[in-house]
């Protein structure tokens, strides 16, 4: 019995872009073959949407007046409403219209992933995946004071535990908050 190893908790990714990496990534996106790459990356951070949710988002589901969007194709299969920041609204307003009504004209997930990997590599960023943009966005919103409930709704997470995996508040931020008391 002593030879049997107990299962361990899986190691979860907690990769968040630094400010410098964000600038480098945005600059690299500007040179992408995919015209809307920067808009996709920025909206992923701003909205906390998963890749599939974002690439399937339609103009008709974005109410730029109220600042809300309906994400129909979610991981859970249940549509959810999200808030749109001022920056997200600005990005959506400036997107060229597509024939199929989607925000982005992306041919396939595999071609998109190749383009995204290319801009990350050209930006000099190591060990970074598209899904890590959710970590970056959740962390930024948490540092701005968003509650767990707000983050759960925006990101489509079903538990506070999941939010804690994505919102990676560092010791530097905690020290800054304590100094302001």
Regions found by a protein language model. Give the residues of each.
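C-terminal secondary-structure termini that scaffold catalytic or DNA-interacting sites
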Residues: 66, 94, 180-181
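N-terminal core-binding DNA-recognition domain of tyrosine site-specific recombinases/integrases
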Residues: 11, 32-35, 105-111, 127-132
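C-terminal catalytic core of tyrosine-transesterase DNA break-rejoin enzymes
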Residues: 39-42, 46-53, 118-123, 134-158, ...
